[in-house]
């Protein structure tokens, strides 16, 4: 019988305690659980990029995949597993990590029934330091692009197509991007992609929105919405300084109130 907090609380009746002591945990087959992380960031050209790892073992040996791994049963939660895997692959500890969806098709992994809890991690521009984990041959940041055949992932190492990815990871990535495009219209997700959340211009935030949405936005309307939703509500505060750009712009600071919304 597992020593859970409920058992230690002393709230069990003698009958329930006897039931738990005699319970056979092998009565039902159990799937394994993995945490897979869609790690998104921006390159210097403000293009949306994703971290992929090249698998070093079977199945799908040599194929590109999302960073992730098995949850250590009885030792961590699936969210803790996602944070651990993200840190092992990137060295990032404080990313905006959000649960995306649970993928549980019984045939998604040729080894056994594996349930994947997928997460989206938004990494500030310029802060992603790639390092392949123990079970990967390589790790690379790819630019996400689209052509007539669908989504591609491009880097100096070549072009990877959706169908070239391991498992059902193309489906996971598509869902993550679709969800981000929806959320960015009403949630502060874009702030987590800023290079410096403590000192940024409206134009930087607008560029991120345009990249995610893949469309041009009107600056006047964007500024109006930004001031209304963030400055007037105290979630962002103006700084008494301007940027060093050719046309200096007012700089802003993301407050702790807005940071706590992501915790």
Question: For each predicted feature, which ranges?
Answer:
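Nudix hydrolase/Nudix homology domain
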Residues: 1-10, 14, 64, 126-263
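Conserved Nudix-box catalytic region and its N-terminal flanking loop in Nudix hydrolases
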Residues: 47-88, 92, 183-211
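A short coil-to-beta-strand element that immediately follows conserved catalytic motifs
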Residues: 93-101, 218-220
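Short acidic (Asp/Glu) patches
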Residues: 83, 98-105
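Acidic pyrophosphate-coordinating catalytic loop
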Residues: 28, 103-115
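Solvent-exposed residues in well-ordered beta-strands and their adjoining turns
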Residues: 40, 122-124, 255
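N-terminal strand-loop-strand
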Residues: 17-18, 22-65, 79, 94
């Amino acid at each position: 019988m597992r020593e859970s907090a409920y058992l230690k609380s002393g709230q069990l009746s003698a009958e329930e305690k006897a039931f738990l002591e005699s319970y056979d945990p092998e009565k039902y087959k159990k799937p394994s659980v993995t945490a897979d992380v869609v790690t998104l960031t921006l390159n210097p050209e403000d293009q949306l990029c994703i971290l992929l790892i090249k698998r070093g073992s079977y199945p799908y040996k040599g194929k590109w995949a999302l960073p992730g791994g098995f949850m250590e049963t009885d030792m961590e939660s699936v969210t803790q597993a996602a944070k651990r895997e993200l840190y092992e692959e990137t060295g990032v500890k404080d990313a905006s990590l959000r649960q995306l969806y649970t993928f549980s098709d019984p045939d998604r992994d040729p080894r056994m029934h594996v349930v994947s809890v997928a997460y989206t991690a938004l990494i500030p521009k310029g802060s992603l330091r790639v390092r392949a984990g123990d079970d990967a041959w390589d790790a690379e940041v790819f630019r996400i692009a689209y052509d007539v055949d669908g989504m591609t992932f491009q880097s100096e190492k070549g072009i990877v197509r959706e169908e070239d990815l391991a498992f059902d990871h193309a489906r996971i990535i598509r869902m993550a991007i679709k969800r981000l495009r929806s959320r960015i219209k009403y949630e502060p997700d874009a702030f987590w992609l800023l290079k410096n959340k403590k000192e940024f211009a409206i134009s930087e935030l607008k560029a991120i929105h345009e990249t995610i949405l893949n469309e041009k936005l009107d600056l006047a309307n964007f500024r109006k919405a930004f001031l209304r939703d963030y400055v007037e509500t105290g979630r962002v505060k103006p700084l008494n300084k301007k940027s060093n750009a050719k046309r200096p712009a007012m700089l802003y600071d993301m407050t702790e109130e807005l940071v706590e919304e992501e915790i």
